[in-house]
Amino acid sequence: MTKVGGGDAKNTLYCSFCGKSQHEVRKLIAGPTVFICDECVELCMDIIREENKSSLVKSRDGIPTPKEICKVLDDYVIGQPQAKRVLSVAVHNHYKRLNHATKHNDVELAKSNILLIGPTGSGKTLLAQTLARILDVPFTMADATTLTEAGYVGEDVENIILKLLQASDYNVERAQRGIVYIDEIDKISRKSDNPSITRDVSGEGVQQALLKIMEGTVASVPPQGGRKHPQQEFLQVDTTNILFICGGAFAGLEKIISTRGKGTSIGFGATVQAPDDRRTGEIFRKVEPEDLLKFGLIPEFVGRLPVIATLEDLDEEALKKILTEPKNALVKQYQRLFEMENTELSFQDEALNVVAKKAIERRTGARGLRSIMEGILLDTMFDLPGLDSVEQVVIGPDVVEGKSRPLYIYAERNEKSGTSA
């Protein structure tokens, strides 16, 4: 470290970054071939501090804390507070476990894969995608309905690991810490409570095939995908530290939960059961492993999903918030599209209420909101690029119900016109 002091001009040292001489600064730090002054060091520290403010607060292990994970989930996913808490804790503990494994050998911490149960359109897939974004780890999604046992037409379960490798640019080390989300997991349930005497290659067979990679095994993955050949070279991927999140709507599971413990009887002496008026998401909260077994999942598969998070039905208020509040909310997306035509798109508050009601009637949850919005704005998006000076498009409740056309406000005349969309 060179301190400020007098000296000849020939021997004067300069900061390699800002060009100031050693006489103009308090301290000049010398490297092998460069010098940096205390002012440039302070500037670098300011930049790093600013970046740290915008990033997640980390725990001592360098992993986002459960509260911070939950907070970021709130930015993208509306509602589902209990599911967010369960996921935040499970994911935090999983990556804490990975750090622990490199430091201690006395206690081995087991992996806790996650099962998400909730009605369609309640946010299962979005939660998994957002988690991967928060943690900056490789993430891939697989559809359980396309999977079959090895040797049959369809995708092998090893293809899931191949997709994870592709998401990590074939960095095996990074892929081995990734997250896999398997959607439609309820579709691979076996068709009856009793083990089948015939081969069920896309149901129970897939559950059996998934057991080893979910628990932890070294999978041989063909780099180019497809079926395995004897002459082909394989990549060896250890799945022990890959977090598996399985999600499904589990249609019909609510009936199994509701009737649990009540028994069944027929004939004149049978007890008439009162209908269960609770919402599906509310019933799901009472789910037990035995209910999943009755639904058609095999015991070994249920045992490998120790963490169960249930999602609620989205009500009208939640659907309305989904339209406007998240960072990538639907209304914001369409407003950005209209901005590209130099037009402002605005929705009246009552119009958003009607959109939410329509989604509830369709029973498609948040997933149905986009199709409703497309139907409302289709004609406007078709005509708008060919119209001049449309400053604003206003959508009211009558427009959503199909009783009237959007209101156009023109910049030239500065007057309102109910011109056809």
Curated annotation (Swiss-Prot):
The protein, known as: ATP-dependent Clp protease ATP-binding subunit ClpX
One GO process term, biological-process aspect: cell division
Domain of life (superkingdom): Bacteria
Protein family according to the UniProt entry: Belongs to the ClpX chaperone family.
GO molecular function: ATP binding; ATP hydrolysis activity; ATP-dependent protein folding chaperone; protein dimerization activity; unfolded protein binding; zinc ion binding
Function: ATP-dependent specificity component of the Clp protease. It directs the protease to specific substrates. Can perform chaperone functions in the absence of ClpP.
NCBIfam families documented for this protein: clpX, PRK05342.1
Pfam families xrefs: AAA_2, ClpB_D2-small, zf-C4_ClpX
A single Gene Ontology CC term: HslUV protease complex
Naturally occurring in which organism (per UniProt): Methylocella silvestris (strain DSM 15510 / CIP 108128 / LMG 27833 / NCIMB 13906 / BL2)
Binding residues for Zn(2+): 15, 18, 37, 40
Binding site for ATP: 119-126
Keywords: ATP-binding, Chaperone, Metal-binding, Nucleotide-binding, Zinc
ClpX-type ZB domain mapped to chain residues: 3-56
Assembly notes: Component of the ClpX-ClpP complex. Forms a hexameric ring that, in the presence of ATP, binds to fourteen ClpP subunits assembled into a disk-like structure with a central cavity, resembling the structure of eukaryotic proteasomes.
